[in-house]
Amino acid sequence: MKKTALVTGGSGGIGSEICRALAEDGWQVAVCYKNGRAAAEALVSELKERGLCAEVFYCDIGDKDSIDKCVAEVRDSFGFVTLLVNNAGTADIELFTDMTDEKLCEMMNVNLLGAMRMSRAVLPEMIREHSGNVINITSVWGEKGASCEVAYSAAKAGLIGFTKALAREVAISGIRAVSYTHLRAHETLANL
């Protein structure tokens, strides 16, 4: 039985490289997108032409209903989600004092809460199976902070903290939760 990876933000630069690496390593890859449908479809076509297994799925990680629908569709197509890669995110370069409350909420919703919701959607089955991995793609700004990216930095710092706490909570069930900064995200994920 092939292992299934669900990758959010799978149509973008880092996400598409993660999808390629996983597909090349024999994974069934759910390439999830919100805004990059054409790029996601092009990536899946490229992978299928090479005899690799991938499908496109729409997912707005800022919306719980969209997450639940996406996870259900991935399960229907591929079965058990063995690996979740929370890669989707958004960033704006803007002074914190100029940021609207709506933009602040969007940063937290997409960069932190979206990953938490995606994890919550796949974890019950992983816990039942005593198997699975959650990888959260973070940023060096979550560790160091960045001027004009205060909300993004805070959300990514929260994602790092979430990952550490989640790892402790799910380890007893045989599940791993790890984070990688995007500077290292291009490294192979084959050993996870």
Walk through the language-model features, giving the residues of each.
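Conserved glycine-rich cofactor-binding loop
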Residues: S11-G12
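Alpha-helical segment proximal to the catalytic Tyr-Lys
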Residues: P124, R168-I172
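Conserved glycine-rich Rossmann-like NAD(P)H-binding loop of the short-chain dehydrogenase/reductase
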Residues: W27-E41
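Conserved small/polar residues in nucleotide/adenosyl-binding loops
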Residues: T181-T188
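Substrate-binding pocket helix/loop in short-chain dehydrogenase/reductase
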Residues: L95-F96, K103-M108
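Residue(s) in the substrate-gating loop at a strand-loop-helix junction
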Residues: S139
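Active-site helix of classical SDR
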Residues: S119, A155, T163
